[in-house]
């Protein structure tokens, strides 16, 4: 990979820059672009370019969170697809997580954000919108990505729920507090590292010359990551000897099966 820094925050400048350098590369990994600009930038580039374009803050996070939830629900006796999943904070990470959960088959995703346009974006994707109190009362699983330490008070935690408070360095509620308040399982952002996802996602896409990284490929990556976790782990260690190789293979298969392979004349 070649790191390229763009000293400009204008979405048009970023889009034009990436568009102009894209012929040099087999894929583009976008990083550290805030919402809502990240959505426009990725959508335009993904539509125009014939190589994979992926914003890691959205999709790398979403893949590892899905993997973590597959194991957390197993620990807690919940069925992910039948659970109500609450997403607190609908920025880049929260929106990416919401969309991937909906694609995976979770029927009830309810989100909350102070930004009305973020809530509208979730509604357009097929999710529901509510207040923070509504999300905390209804959700069997709560995922928080707000960047607001201490936002979730112990008295707001639903008994038996799964709570992933992912903001770093300080979460919306600490795992200890969530468990003391009655959560069946709780973790913070230190347990969920994007680096479990993006190496295999990009290596797999590049190996088969995929034109994009679609949801089937992301879900395949999440399933592979989840399988490698030890008995009491949410997700495996970054240093697990097989995880990146197996994620790569899973992504390759999903790309081939979903027909996003570049055909040469």
Where are these regions (language model features)?
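Short, ordered loop/turn segments at secondary-structure junctions
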Residues: 6-7, 32-35, 56-59, 114-115, ...
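Adenosine-phosphate binding glycine-rich loop
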Residues: 56, 165-167, 172-264
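Glycine/serine-rich phosphate-binding loop and adjoining beta1-alpha1 elements at the start
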Residues: 1-83, 202, 206, 258-260
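Glycine-rich phosphate/diphosphate-binding loop of Rossmann-like nucleotide-binding domains
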Residues: 59, 63-147
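General beta-strand structural signal in soluble alpha/beta enzymes
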Residues: 3, 29-32, 53-56, 111-112, ...
